[in-house]
Swiss-Prot record:
Name the record gives this protein: Myoglobin
UniProt GO molecular function: heme binding; metal ion binding; nitrite reductase activity; oxygen binding; oxygen carrier activity; peroxidase activity
Organism: Ovis aries
Family designation: Belongs to the globin family.
DNA-binding among keywords: no
UniProt-listed PROSITE patterns: GLOBIN (PS01033)
GO cellular component: extracellular exosome; sarcoplasm
Length: 154
């Protein structure tokens, strides 16, 4: 399920757009996640009180967390599939502390692709979307495998 060099290049080119405003992209991804899948909000004590999109847009904490999420993901994507150490660390915190199910990783992957396409339609066409989808699926599969090692049934 690996990606070709060309696909990785599409992923990293798209990610370059994210890096121009990691916090802004991250905030939009989390807003898309929480509005599209309100059940995911229950995993975030810090954000449970945010009920509307306007409240989410006004939240500096949400923006900071979006920055944290996409910074970590960017570091993983730049490893081009050689992300074992990063995924192990992330899976430990997401399984043991945060209890984030793999399904929620699918939801955020969809949100990432949606936000990138909405913000950068001319730079994130079908080929780039397909490559990003494959890269995020690889990440999710590796997270799921690590969850299994940890005994987490997420």
């Amino acid at each position: 399920m690996g990606l070709s060099d060309g696909e990785w290049q599409l992923v990293l080119n798209a990610w370059g757009k994210v890096e121009a405003d990691v916090a802004g992209h991250g905030q939009e991804v989390l807003i898309r996640l929480f509005t599209g899948h309100p059940e995911t909000l229950e995993k975030f004590d810090k954000f449970k009180h945010l009920k509307t999109e306007a409240e989410m847009k006004a939240s500096e904490d949400l923006k900071k967390h979006g920055n944290t999420v996409l910074t970590a993901l960017g570091g993983i994507l730049k490893k081009k599939g050689h992300h074992e150490a990063e995924v192990k660390h992330l899976a430990e915190s997401h399984a043991n502390k945060h209890k984030i199910p793999v399904k929620y990783l699918e939801f955020i992957s969809d949100a990432i692709i949606h936000v990138l396409h909405a913000k950068h339609p001319s730079d994130f066409g079908a080929d780039a979307q397909g490559a990003m989808s494959k890269a995020l699926e690889l990440f999710r599969n590796d997270m799921a495998a690590q969850y299994k090692v940890l005994g987490f049934q997420g």
